[in-house]
Design a protein with these regions (language model features):
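Helix-loop element at the rim of GNAT/NAT acetyltransferase active sites that forms part
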Residues: 17, 28-41, 170-182
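Acyl-donor-binding surface of acyltransferase catalytic domains
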Residues: 1-7, 73, 85-153
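A short beta-loop-alpha structural element at the N-terminal edge
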Residues: 7-26, 156-168
Length: 270
């Protein structure tokens, strides 16, 4: 047993940290596990395999469970994935992996761990370890209605480039509470897969941005942020309506967005 492996007392399973070499193991477990949670964002499930905590449990014969919740922004770890193979106890492995992740968390600066739930089976496992619900994420959809773009006279809207990412990350950090902020690494990943991304400038300084993706199902407004001091001036509305017109002009008649149930300002905007 190596220094990276740990077998808890009385447990039939061994835990170790993952590495990039575990890509095929992770892919197989996530593909076949009857219970699996995968965080919804712009990263792949393999992007954090060399980071901590990212754990795998195994017995003498096979790899049986995964848990990853490494930080991406300061102090915040989202549960990136959790999966358990068929025929092994989900609750017991969750508790085992979670306790190991929790013991690692302080060493990597994690003070808060969150989970974006998409399946109800995971809720009692989280609650059993002290998680509590803080908000809900809701889904809104636009279906092809013509819109008017009204940009404030003092602002300029243009296509985003990779050179804007530092400024975009600064806007994002100031616009959101820590739990909902994204790192420049995450924003770069979002930019790479975006179908349409724009920024708004005032006095040649980026004060707002949006990034949207598209698929056979339609477009999706993946991220939008406005400098707090520039909010309530119509800038966010201009970014949204400009994106709607862009996709409408390309024959895309549906666009979706997710937002928090307690974020009334964004709901009014959308």
């Amino acid at each position: 047993m190596t220094e990276h492996e740990k077998k808890p007392p009385t447990s039939p399973w061994t835990i170790r940290s993952t590495t990039k070499r575990d890509r095929s193991i992770v892919a197989s477990l996530l593909s076949h596990a009857p219970h699996r949670h995968i965080h919804l964002d712009w990263y792949t499930t393999y992007d954090f395999l060399d980071e901590s905590p990212s754990l795998i449990a195994f017995d003498d014969q096979r790899d049986i469970a995964l848990l990853a919740c490494p930080p991406d922004t300061a102090g915040i770890g989202w549960i990136r994935h959790f999966a358990v193979s068929e025929g092994v106890p989900t609750a017991a492995l969750w508790e085992l992996l979670w306790k190991q992740a929790l013991s690692i968390a302080p060493s990597v600066g994690i003070t808060t761990v969150s989970a974006l739930i998409t399946q109800s089976w995971f809720i009692p496992l989280l609650q059993g370890q002290g998680f509590s619900q803080s908000t809900e994420v809701i889904f809104l959809e636009w279906k092809g209605r013509e819109v008017q773009v009204d940009l404030p006279l003092h602002a300029t809207l243009r296509t985003m480039t990779s050179h804007d990412l530092d400024a975009v990350a600064n806007v994002d950090k100031r616009a959101f509470q820590p739990l909902w902020q994204h790192s420049i690494r995450a924003l770069d990943a979002a930019f790479e897969i975006s179908a349409f991304a724009t920024v708004v400038e005032v006095d040649e300084k980026v004060v707002a941005y949006q990034m949207s993706t598209s698929s056979a199902l339609g477009a999706h407004l993946a991220r939008l942020a406005v400098e707090p001091k520039m909010q309530s001036q119509g800038i966010a509305k201009a970014l949204v309506t400009h994106a709607l017109r862009y996709f409408h002009g390309r024959g895309i008649e549906r666009m979706s967005v997710n937002t928090q149930a307690d974020n009334k300002r964004s709901q009014v905007l959308y």
